[in-house]
Curated annotation (Swiss-Prot):
Subunit of the V0 complex of vacuolar(H+)-ATPase (V-ATPase), a multisubunit enzyme composed of a peripheral complex (V1) that hydrolyzes ATP and a membrane integral complex (V0) that translocates protons. V-ATPase is responsible for acidifying and maintaining the pH of intracellular compartments and in some cell types, is targeted to the plasma membrane, where it is responsible for acidifying the extracellular environment. May play a role in coupling of proton transport and ATP hydrolysis. Regulator of osteoclast fusion and bone formation. One of its GO terms (cellular component) is proton-transporting V-type ATPase, V0 domain. One of its GO terms (biological process) is vacuolar acidification. V-ATPase is a heteromultimeric enzyme made up of two complexes: the ATP-hydrolytic V1 complex and the proton translocation V0 complex. The V1 complex consists of three catalytic AB heterodimers that form a heterohexamer, three peripheral stalks each consisting of EG heterodimers, one central rotor including subunits D and F, and the regulatory subunits C and H. The proton translocation complex V0 consists of the proton transport subunit a, a ring of proteolipid subunits c9c'', rotary subunit d, subunits e and f, and the accessory subunits ATP6AP1/Ac45 and ATP6AP2/PRR. Keywords: Hydrogen ion transport, Ion transport, Transport. Disulfide bonds: none annotated. The keyword Membrane does not apply. Belongs to the V-ATPase V0D/AC39 subunit family. This is V-type proton ATPase subunit d 2. It comes from Bos taurus (Bovine). GO terms for molecular function: proton-transporting ATPase activity, rotational mechanism. It holds the Pfam family vATP-synt_AC39.
Amino acid sequence: MLESAELNFNADHGYLEGLVRGCKAGLLTRRDYVNLVQCENLEDLKIHLQTTDYGNFLANQATPLTVSVIDTEMRKKLCREFEYFRNHSLEPLSTFFTYMTCSYMIDNVILLMNGALQNKPVKDVLVKCHPLGHFTEMEAVNIAETPSDLFNAILVETPLAPFFQDCTSENALDELNIEILRNKLYKSYIEAFYKFCKNHGDVTAEVMCPILEFEADRRAFIITLNSFGTELSKEDRETLYPTCGKLHPEGLRLLAQAEDFEQMKRVADSYGVYKPLFEAVSDSSGGKTLEDVFYEREVQMNVLAFNRQFHYGVFYAYTKLKEQEMRNIVWIAECISQRQRTKINSYIPIL
């Protein structure tokens, strides 16, 4: 017998959950990837993708086909699916979808700010922005000279507004400060999303909290790695770490003091979930990077999310799995396009 919470979930969200599970069943299989890597050119790739759930999504594209066009059209297709889910959702699932879009909005804001710093035309940068992170005021981002300007003139009416509380300053938006701003926004965003899922409770919390804990810790590791050899102080580095992961508090304190990859690895060695990931990183050419092993772990967690029912995590997991699939296709397409077939199998299979 279903309990009342599960019955309510089915009544409000059961249709969409069934739909997203159907979409997940349409992800590319290992057999599909074997066929893709055997393609001689991008037209062959297009023909094979037509036999999958991607269908004729490239039918209206002029030849010769480019990797950029394939990437753009895949994003548009994902966006159409996501918007269908969101437009047919009820609260609190609608708010969950809004949280999902915030990460793309942050990336778009940073992309536009970097474009403005390099004096690139706004329309050229807008083309590169992710459609899931679109908001009305995006074109005005290039007028901001400080984080305070950015908030007051542009973002005050967007879902990003709450995440700017700890980010407003009068510092000039140079390359380093823009990257610091990105990480502060992500810290506030992940912590808020984690709190929302935890407060929601039930299976959604049981599935999403570990996923977001991993995402928080991954960001802490990557921030640390990217800060080596930069002007960022250890104290400032620590303020950028999200505090909702397994590393909090002691692991983050130790990570802030790390001065090289080996010291980072020693911190990871104290955590059962992260030790094998760092051990899988290879120094050799063509070996796995830290980013690779994090992506692999993310795929595993998102696949496992579908083993549970009656929760919002399937929507997050499907979107992340679809993004990994898109990265795989772009990687294979780039290798085909550039005739660099030696690394064509360095993708991350999902099913």
